[in-house]
């Protein structure tokens, strides 16, 4: 059913399916997102769940991101485990699949960019059968900060995501670490209507510009991995880790593949969250 998208994913490192979710299905998701937004009222600063846009170093009341909403909101937990999503994932990851994380990026008007990076630098595993599935909750265009991916970059090197002067890990690639294979002008914007789904490989280079429009760009992102991909930084509580299985069977015999990798250390002075950590990047693209 998704043969064309499979070929594109293997070749480019990403693909998209427009209107994968119907208007009615997205409306239901947005009902839950509204409750999540209401939960941010009264929150004064970033916490474990909510992150806010910053202006001149000061926290605003503009919601930037909700971290791991599946842990706190039953409806989102049901969505990330839904048969509709899992059936799609089987075409890319096989039968045995584990949920890794989730987040909603809100990108309000004037919302900040996300500098170019590879997710693989953040959470290395024993193999890279690992992807992020995204759902457009608003119509998404270049003007309101659509994500761009660099075709074929998932087959290449893993770049250093550290400040070249201080050595601190900043969740982004300094321009001085770029080479001829990293040219953001060759990136492909993933745009589309509400309900569009994107999938990008964990090693794919990607980033997104600021929101220059008057329309926010809400983007639900969900990470999934093959069940035999073991997190090299540890799994935390093993019971919680096992509860993240969404399809098939788990294993205690990880599949090890020789791959380029790095580890996300030493931590940035701004912490381990991408938006704040990228403040430590001195050679930005956006």
UniProtKB/Swiss-Prot annotation:
EC number: 1.-.-.-
Gene Ontology molecular function terms on file: 2-oxoglutarate-dependent dioxygenase activity; iron ion binding
Top-rank EC class of the record's enzyme: oxidoreductase
Keywords for this protein: Dioxygenase, Oxidoreductase
Keyword Oxidoreductase: yes
Pfam families on file: PhyH
SUPFAM superfamilies: Clavaminate synthase-like (SSF51197)
Function summary: Required for hypophosphite oxidation.
Family membership: Belongs to the PhyH family.
PANTHER family cross-referenced by the UniProt entry: PHYTANOYL-COA DIOXYGENASE DOMAIN CONTAINING 1 (PTHR20883), PHYTANOYL-COA HYDROXYLASE (PTHR20883:SF46)
Protein name in UniProt: Probable alpha-ketoglutarate-dependent hypophosphite dioxygenase
Upper taxonomic lineage: Bacteria, Pseudomonadati, Pseudomonadota, Gammaproteobacteria, Pseudomonadales
Gene from which this protein is expressed: htxA
